[in-house]
């Protein structure tokens, strides 16, 4: 009985440790996207277009352009045109039309998460 219980526990742990979230990052390298975020308790929406080399973001009647440097299929660095500190993005999981990501200022440990939806 003890061996049977250990075997069942082993199978259960093996099955759960093998789970990996879906990451079809290449599907989200380029395209048009929306991203909702919160500032001081107010929900805001940003739209951006990303190409292999650039990201153009439209938010609050402003346009911000940044260069994109891909580290691998799931990670990239954005450098804004105003030469602010670069931001590192990592795609954590994907669905058919969206991806969950984390981002942080390069060199800083504090990370935030978000979800972007592909609109095209």
Model-identified regions with their sequence ranges:
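Bacterial signal peptide processing site
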Residues: 19-21
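Tryptophan-anchored aromatic micro-motifs
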Residues: 25-41
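Beta-sheet ligand-binding and adhesion/scaffold domains
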Residues: 37-39, 81-120
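C-terminal motif of bacterial Sec signal peptides marking the signal peptidase cleavage site
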Residues: 14-17
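N-terminal glycine/threonine-rich, aromatic-flanked beta-hairpin/loop signature
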Residues: 43-71
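General beta-strand recognition
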Residues: 34, 56, 76-77, 100
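Positively charged n-region of N-terminal signal peptides that target proteins for export
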Residues: 1-4
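Short, conserved beta-turn/loop elements at beta-strand boundaries and strand-helix junctions
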Residues: 73-75, 96-97
